[in-house]
């Protein structure tokens, strides 16, 4: 009888583990943490000045812990843009989100936290375009973001995608992200009132981001 109970308990635990949702992150510096991403990616965290010194303080780590999920891949590269154009009009094809769409593993959920650097480069946003992209199109945020979501939807048809909108961004970025996400039925979670140093979230800022994401996730369950 004891062996039977042990077998049932093991089966329940294994079943729970197999049902655990896998989460991937596609982001820029806000989502980096050394040791959680590919070694050759540029990173910003841990950062003593911002007070974020442990991976558990990262916004995504808090959300994953809160929901009992597991991290699949953190594909975040500090300073990266969604499109292939970066600061000083440099070519960012090697680190652009559109280049990294095959690097997220096989998650059930994907959080995309990008657009901040695209906004800060002050490059043109381009036109809304939802098909027949050219290589040149991918150097502009609007067509590049549409290309990203379109391909993610096709490559991972069962995956749930959330797009995070940083606070303090231009109206142009906010409108562009919302319009493109609406086209692909991707929820936008706009975070607000985030404490920052050097334009990056502090430990308190990370917690604020996590809390606002959690509030959005909880609202979906109602």
Q: Model-predicted segments: where are they?
A:
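Bacterial Sec-dependent N-terminal signal peptides
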Residues: 1-20
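Conserved SGNH/GDSL esterase-like catalytic core that processes O-acyl groups on lipids
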Residues: 22-24, 39-126
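Short hydrophobic segments within beta-strands
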Residues: 26-27, 164
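Residue-level detector of flexible, active-site-proximal loop/helix-junction positions
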Residues: 30, 78-81, 168, 195
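Short active-site segment of divalent metal-dependent hydrolases/proteases
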Residues: 30-31, 205
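Short N-terminal binding/cap micro-motifs at the start of the first secondary-structure element
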Residues: 33-35
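Alpha-helical cap/lid subdomain in secreted, periplasmic
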Residues: 93-222
């Amino acid at each position: 009888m004891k062996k039977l109970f042990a077998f049932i308990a093991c089966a329940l635990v294994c079943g729970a583990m197999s049902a655990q949702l896998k989460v991937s992150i596609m982001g820029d510096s806000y989502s980096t943490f050394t040791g959680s991403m590919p070694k050759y990616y540029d990173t910003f965290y841990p950062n003593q000045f911002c007070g974020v010194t442990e991976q558990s303080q990262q916004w995504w780590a808090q959300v994953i812990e809160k929901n009992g999920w597991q991290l699949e891949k953190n594909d975040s590269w500090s300073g990266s843009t969604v499109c292939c154009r970066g600061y000083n009009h440099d070519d960012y094809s090697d680190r652009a989100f559109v280049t990294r769409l095959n690097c997220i593993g096989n998650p059930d959920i994907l959080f995309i936290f990008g657009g901040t650097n695209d906004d800060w480069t002050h490059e043109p946003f381009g036109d809304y375009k939802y098909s027949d992209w050219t290589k040149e199109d991918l150097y502009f945020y609007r067509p590049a973001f549409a290309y990203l979501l379109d391909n993610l939807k096709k490559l991972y048809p069962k995956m749930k995608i959330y797009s995070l909108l940083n606070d303090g961004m231009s109206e142009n970025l906010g409108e562009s992200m919302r319009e493109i996400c609406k086209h692909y039925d991707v929820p936008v979670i706009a975070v607000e009132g985030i404490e920052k140093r050097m334009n990056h979230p502090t430990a308190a800022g990370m917690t604020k981001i996590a809390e606002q994401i959690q509030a959005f996730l909880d609202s979906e369950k109602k």
